[in-house]
């Protein structure tokens, strides 16, 4: 609006991550110069123009080619390809049997490495049965598991999908409602950290969160663990607000309450002590074959103590940490006097279909190996604020359908991926663009140069694939409308997109 009105008046920006009264007042007392966000604006504006140009022209092009409305997008099509590729992996998967030999040593059972065929397994079993078993080595190692980071929106969506079956959009909607109720901070964040200025507030918020979770905090919260000024993006990580202490819990819908408790529990985990345990690996040798047994002895439960309690509270399922502790009489060189053995057969399993949780993870990783600049952060495809919408879009378009938690491609979705060229559906293209958009945000790349590249990409796409000989005649789509004609949408003025009716 500022540009359209040709306004040149100075502008201050209210930049807050919470709509609590004190945060709003503090925000107005510390208004930001709008010019501080010029590069962020340029990057976001270039992103939206690129998405519009690629989506509008790609959609018109392939809809006309196949006489069917085929929605194509810079992010949605690579996302669909991820799902289709997984379906192809499942359909082409051939299960294979393999075997291991289990050696029962009385106090524990050790297992051999994978054996590819049954005759070999039987031969090993025969040799072991006649052999002498002894403990070849014992290796002990103290290990620490750091607490998880604070939630960003993608992490919250993945956890809610895994625990409650919520779709990414449902989680975002519930979080938005909690934000408007002043119970959590701005939800559409991609950061896992907070600024150093929030150190004291983190201590206060942990106390408030413990009240929501009915948890007794007997340690001093380690606020430094969640502070990283360099990694805080436009908004800090998702947090509860101090208002949760006075909230009418009974008035909050159950679905929203689960999300609020997830956010509160994540804060408590993040500032809790480490989980420490001792791992033990015992190697037993018999008839020139090694067998391995693994043990775990917990030294300090740390944050996992809260995780067990909170996940049980949220899901109604009892959670526990399994320990395998070996007695002190298990020492190197010990001969196992009485041992028994048997063959265990196993089957390789196909990869699982994507859920909202695993698809968001795949989107975060997609194309990361193709980033051209090592100095930019690898963020995959789509932004964390838009990934839920992308999933819902490809479902709405009829390319994907839900089967329980699973996301399954339809025949139309599979055919679309077969129809469009690699440069449209490959995450590599998006990764290259994402790296340049980040450089624009840093002031290290020209928005005009980026848009010139997009314009050229779209022009080449239409020029190349509008020819009839590029139509895959093996594909058939159900005709939905009569196509009158096809023309390239004018791209010399990409800053003023127009509605195409």
What are these regions (language model features)?
Residues 1-142, 237-297:
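Phosphate-backbone binding and catalysis cores of DNA-processing enzymes
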Residues 23, 155, 358:
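Ca2+-coordinating acidic residues in Ca2+-binding motifs
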Residues 67-71, 140-149, 158-164, 187-196, ...:
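Conserved short loop/turn motifs at secondary-structure junctions
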Residues 92, 168-169, 190-488, 492, ...:
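Basic, low-complexity terminal or inter-domain segments flanking catalytic cores
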Residues 131-146, 340-349:
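Positively charged, polyanion-binding regions of nucleic-acid-associated proteins
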Residues 152:
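N-terminal cationic and glycine-rich segments that engage phosphates or anionic surfaces
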Residues 181-187:
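Secretory-pathway/luminal and periplasmic proteins that interact with or process carbohydrate-rich
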